[in-house]
Swiss-Prot record:
Protein name in UniProt: NADH-quinone oxidoreductase subunit K
Catalytic reaction(s) noted: a quinone + NADH + 5 H(+)(in) = a quinol + NAD(+) + 4 H(+)(out)
Lineage of producing organism: Bacteria, Pseudomonadati, Myxococcota, Myxococcia, Myxococcales
Molecular functions (GO terms): NADH:ubiquinone reductase (non-electrogenic) activity; quinone binding
Quaternary context: NDH-1 is composed of 14 different subunits. Subunits NuoA, H, J, K, L, M, N constitute the membrane sector of the complex.
One Pfam family per UniProt: Oxidored_q2
InterPro entries per UniProt: NADH_UbQ_OxRdtase_chain4L/K (IPR001133), NUOK/Mnh_C1-like (IPR039428)
Length: 100
C-alpha cells in the first residue's frame, strides 16, 4: 500500500506546475490547461484523504470538481475561440492591451 504522503507530494508537485503555468505563460490555452492541472491536483488530495479515512465524501467532492472542471473547460474554450476569431490571437497580454 502506498503511503498517503506520496499522493500528497504528487498533488503538491502537480499544483505547483499548474500554478507556474498560470503565472508565467501568456497563451490562454496553456493557462486553461494549467488551471485544469491544478484542479486535478486538488482532486488527488481529496481522494488521498478519502482513502486514508475510508470516507466517501472525498470521492463525492472529486466527482463534483470534475463536473465543474468540465463546464469550466467548455466555457473557457468557447471564450478563447471567440477571442481568437475576433482578435486573431490568444495571447493574454495582446488581448488585454486591445481592451484598454
Amino acid at each position: 500500500m502506498v503511503p498517503v504522503t506520496w499522493y500528497l507530494w504528487l498533488a503538491a508537485m502537480l499544483f505547483t506546475i499548474g500554478l507556474s503555468g498560470v503565472l508565467l505563460k501568456r497563451n490562454a490555452l496553456i493557462v486553461m490547461m494549467s488551471v485544469e492541472l491544478m484542479l486535478n491536483a486538488a482532486n488527488l488530495t481529496f481522494l488521498a484523504f478519502a482513502r486514508q479515512t475510508g470516507d466517501v465524501g472525498g470521492h463525492a467532492i472529486a466527482f463534483f470538481v470534475i463536473a465543474v472542471a468540465a463546464a469550466e473547460a467548455a466555457v473557457g474554450l468557447a471564450v478563447v475561440i471567440a477571442i481568437y476569431r475576433t482578435r486573431g490571437t490568444v495571447n493574454i497580454d495582446e488581448v488585454r492591451a486591445l481592451h484598454e
